[in-house]
Structure formats: C-alpha cells, structure tokens
From Swiss-Prot:
This is Peroxisomal protein PEX21. Changing K230E: Does not affect formation of a ternary complex composed of PEX21 and PEX7 along with PTS2-containing cargo proteins. Keywords: Cytoplasm, Peroxisome, Protein transport, Thioester bond, Transport, Ubl conjugation. Monoubiquitinated at Cys-5; acts as a signal for PEX21 extraction and is required for proper export from peroxisomes and recycling. GO terms for molecular function: protein carrier chaperone. It comes from Saccharomyces cerevisiae (strain ATCC 204508 / S288c). InterPro entries: PEX18_PEX21_C. Pfam families: PEX18_PEX21_C. The keyword Membrane does not apply. Interacts with PEX7. Interacts with PEX13. Interacts with SES1. It comes from the Eukaryota. Changing I202D: Does not affect formation of a ternary complex composed of PEX21 and PEX7 along with PTS2-containing cargo proteins. GO terms for biological process: protein import into peroxisome matrix. Receptor that mediates peroxisomal import of proteins containing a C-terminal PTS2-type peroxisomal targeting signal via its interaction with PEX7. Interaction with PEX7 only takes place when PEX7 is associated with cargo proteins containing a PTS2 peroxisomal targeting signal. PEX7 along with PTS2-containing cargo proteins are then translocated through the PEX13-PEX14 docking complex together with PEX21. Acts as an activator of the seryl-tRNA synthetase SES1 by increasing its binding to tRNA.
Amino acid sequence: MPSVCHTSPIEKIIQQGHRIQNDSLIPSKRTKLAHTELTAHYATEDSHVEKHFLHNGSNFDGIDNVRYQNQPSPLTFITPNNTVDSSDWVPQFSSMKIDDSLEFSSEYKRLYSNYESQQRLNSSRQHLPFKNCMIRKTSCTYPPQKTLRQQRQGNRDNPTDAFQFDAEFQVLEREIQKERYEPITRRDEKWFDQDQSELQRIATDIVKCCTPPPSSASSSSTLSSSVESKLSESKFIQLMRNISSGDVTLKKNADGNSASELFSSNNGELVGNRHIFVKDEIHKDILD
C-alpha cells in the first residue's frame, strides 16, 4: 500500500477530537501541546499500536491501551507567555483617584472623626465601674482641653445637669407666661392712682352695705340668705366686687387725666360699655 493512502486511526481520532472541541458551543480554555513530543511519540509508537490493534481485535484491552496512550500527560501542557497575572490589577486599582464634587472636605472629615472618637470615649466612661475609677486614676482622667461643642455634648450626657437644666427652663417658662398675660397698662402706665383708689374705696363700701351682717336668729338668717341670693345675680354688685378686689380698674386715656372705660387687670379685656360724657349745659334758646 503506498504511503499516500496510508491513514493512521490514531490521527483520525485526534483530528475528530480537535474538530469537536472547535465546534463546541461552550468555549473552553485551550492549551498547547508540545508539538515535538507528540511527533516523536506518534512516530515511534504508530506502527506498533496499529499492529496491536489489527491483530488483537478480539482483545478489548488493546482499545483501552490505545485510549490511555492518547491521553496527554500533564507535563506536556505549557502556559502561554502572554497571559496576565490575576493580581496585577490590584496596585493599579488602588492608585486610582476619583474626583467627586459632592465629597466632604478633609477638614470636615477630620472634625467628624474627632466627634465620633469623643462619643465612643463618653460611652466607655458611662459603662466604666466606679471602683475602677477610684483605683486606676489614669484610665478615668479627662482630656486637658475640649471644644465648646464637646463640652455641651458632655453636659447632655450627664443626667444631673440635664435635670438642673429642666428645672431652670421651667422657672423661665413660668416667668414668660406671667409676663405674657400681664396687662400692658400695668407696665406702661401708673394705673393705681388717686382716682383708682377712690373708685376702689367706693366699691368696697357698696359691697359692705349690701352684705347682710351675720346673725344667730333663724328668721334673720333666712332673710340674709334670700338677700344674698338676689344680690349674687346682680351684675352691678358683681362689678363692685371686682373693683373692690382690684380685678377691674380704670383705663386712662392718652392724656392720663381722664378715664372713660373699665378693663380687667387679669387679661386686659374691656369690662362693660364705654362711658360717653355729656356736658351739663342749658340752652337759652329752648327756654325762650
């Protein structure tokens, strides 16, 4: 048989395997076989394997031997020189710089870092036992200097200081409420003058005259109770009682010499109707 028509079954198997690998839908990492080792291997073992395969067809061990011989040795694989190491991107990635316009400034980051460290220090002091503070004085010493913001934060963490602050705030709130409901006339004008004193004296006398004296007799007590019940419904007596107690006073005009209205000293509201002064004159034309 001429050498041109001679076809080795081993080469057919290898070519078919290469064709299947190239046409596969799932790509795999291809490795290079040492061409010199394969050529020498097939040149020396080709004739021997063919004879063994043809003459021992009934023996299946021959096929297994051929299959085992076709498996390449792990030593025959060589790694291409153009591959890149997987760890080469680490220094390049760490050296990258990103210019973010929304990033905080370095001064703000430094201040915030100091703030967080101070918070951790305060929390650790709160959980520290008292006896350890007495024995180890160095572990409980405070820093020599603090900023104003850190001092305020430390004062908030102290429950005693917080309680004192709440008490002072309540006192201040009561003073503000007292000034808010105080009438403006009391602060701006000298409302308790001679006219007001005279009006209060007259109102007190009226209330005393309309109040029956206490008596032990049953008939007089019944009469006094009926009079008191009638007077309690009188708006005039109620007004006199308010003037006598100082709850209602005169509201002076802008000149401060005359008064035409009454107002409540508790809430500043007007009491009753405005007094309209009428001159006491006699017209001669009417008499004529």
